[in-house]
């Protein structure tokens, strides 16, 4: 009787838990008795993953927090190394969390275990020399976007482009009016979605120029509605404070819901750069991108950056599809004229391009990831 397929897997945060869930489902569709062990969240555990530690152990953000938790993180890594070297899996998958997973992958690879890193770090954008560490730690990288694979190919590092899970999750056509009904927004009004970031540091720097841009838009379009996506109560309160200090005369509808629903309900979007820009492209809404970090971080990022663009739609297209304003340019003097241009345009060519790009990265990423891993360990795959 053949031994069941055994896969080691570690996810470090909620987004990784979702990726892990889809990956496990896709493997089990082909190998129902496959076993999964490592670290997972509630979704992975529900799919049968044996989690040796609580996923919260790895979910630390920021240098100070990481330093405070370093002894515990090192202990978790040592325990996982001991477990996997004593009970070698057929393959180990590290999902995102590169600071933790790449170190773990390197040690496991040195011990003869095949390793895969799922979700490429942004080596194509900055600190490209990290690719040599990734090469030393992995047998394969699974990349969401085609330009990521092109970058790895340049360095002869094994990588497969699997498409993006967001492109699978978001339908090709989204329903603006259904989203408005869901969020309780007036149907017959024009809405601008405002997304000033999900982290406190982002909102602190970006909310004010975004609100001041809305002030200028309101003068030109007095009937325009402004709807803000807040990821949690803290961000809601933070935005409200800045709004009342900056433009108390304006009306913002603040909604604690997914950014996706808020963007879908809108006619246009003013957003902070990040994955949300890709999501906006996938819901086919025209956008203007603004982003700001503190001056020192911005200076360092500029020195280490190797890409012309910051927002993913532009990086993916290899040209400027959407206007982006970074650092000092994240200011109403720049944001307002760009936003006016979007509001006064029918944007049909842009939406057409967004649709084409959506199709380009919609490949059933869960299944592609499973098949790539199965090929690596010489297992048959369902194509």
Swiss-Prot record:
The entry's cellular-component GO terms read:
membrane
Q: From the Swiss-Prot or TrEMBL record, what is one GO molecular function term? A: phospholipid binding
Does this UniProt record's set of keywords contain Transferase? yes
- What is this enzyme's class at the first EC digit? transferase
- A GO BP entry: lipid A biosynthetic process
EC number assigned by the record: 2.4.1.182
User: Which is a Pfam family this sequence falls into?
Assistant: LpxB
Q: What's in the keyword line of the UniProt record? A: Glycosyltransferase, Lipid A biosynthesis, Lipid biosynthesis, Lipid metabolism, Transferase
What's the superkingdom here? Bacteria
| Name recorded for this polypeptide | Lipid-A-disaccharide synthase
Similarity remark? Belongs to the LpxB family.
Taxonomy-wise, where does this protein's organism fall, top ranks first? Bacteria, Pseudomonadati, Pseudomonadota, Gammaproteobacteria, Vibrionales
Gene field: lpxB
Q: Report the catalytic activity.
A: a lipid X + a UDP-2-N,3-O-bis[(3R)-3-hydroxyacyl]-alpha-D-glucosamine = a lipid A disaccharide + UDP + H(+)
**Bilayer-spanning residue ranges:** none
Q: SUPFAM superfamilies from the entry?
A: UDP-Glycosyltransferase/glycogen phosphorylase
Briefly, what is this protein's role? Condensation of UDP-2,3-diacylglucosamine and 2,3-diacylglucosamine-1-phosphate to form lipid A disaccharide, a precursor of lipid A, a phosphorylated glycolipid that anchors the lipopolysaccharide to the outer membrane of the cell.
What pathway, per the record?
Bacterial outer membrane biogenesis; LPS lipid A biosynthesis
> Which residues, if any, are the signal sequence?
none
């Amino acid at each position: 009787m053949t031994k069941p397929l055994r896969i080691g897997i570690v996810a470090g945060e909620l987004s990784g838990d979702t990726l892990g869930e889809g990956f496990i489902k896709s493997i089990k569709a082909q190998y129902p008795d496959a076993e999964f062990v490592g670290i997972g969240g509630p979704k992975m555990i529900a799919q049968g993953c044996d989690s040796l530690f609580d996923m919260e152990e790895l979910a630390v953000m920021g240098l100070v927090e990481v330093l405070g938790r370093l002894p515990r993180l090192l202990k978790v890594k040592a325990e996982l190394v001991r477990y996997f070297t004593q009970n070698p899996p057929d393959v180990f998958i590290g999902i995102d969390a590169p600071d933790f997973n790449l170190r773990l992958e390197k040690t496991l690879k040195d011990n003869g275990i095949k390793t895969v890193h799922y979700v490429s770090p942004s080596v194509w954008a900055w600190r490209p020399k990290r690719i040599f560490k990734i090469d030393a730690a992995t047998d394969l990288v699974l990349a969401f976007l085609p330009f990521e694979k092109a970058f790895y190919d340049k360095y002869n590092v094994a990588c497969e482009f699997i498409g993006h899970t967001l492109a699978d999750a978001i339908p090709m056509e989204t329903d603006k009016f259904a989203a408005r009904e869901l969020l309780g927004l007036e149907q017959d009004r024009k809405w601008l979605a405002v997304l000033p970031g999900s982290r406190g540091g982002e909102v602190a720097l970006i909310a004010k120029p975004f609100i001041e841009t809305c002030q200028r838009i309101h003068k030109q379009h007095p009937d325009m509605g402004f709807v803000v996506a807040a990821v949690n109560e803290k961000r809601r309160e933070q935005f409200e404070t800045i709004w009342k200090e900056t433009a108390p005369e304006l009306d913002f509808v603040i909604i604690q819901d997914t950014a996706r629903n808020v963007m879908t309900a809108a006619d246009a979007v003013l957003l902070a750069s990040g994955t949300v820009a890709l999501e906006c492209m996938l819901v086919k809404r025209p956008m203007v991108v603004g982003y700001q970090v503190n001056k020192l971080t911005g200076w360092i990022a500029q020195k280490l950056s190797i890409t012309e663009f910051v927002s993913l739609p532009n990086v993916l297209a290899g040209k400027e599809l959407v206007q982006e304003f970074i650092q000092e340019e994240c200011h109403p003097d720049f944001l307002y004229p760009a936003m006016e241009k979007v509001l006064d345009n029918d944007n049909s060519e842009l939406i057409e391009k967004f649709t084409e790009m959506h199709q380009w990265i919609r490949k059933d990423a869960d299944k592609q990831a499973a098949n790539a891993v199965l090929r690596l360990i010489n297992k048959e795959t369902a194509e």
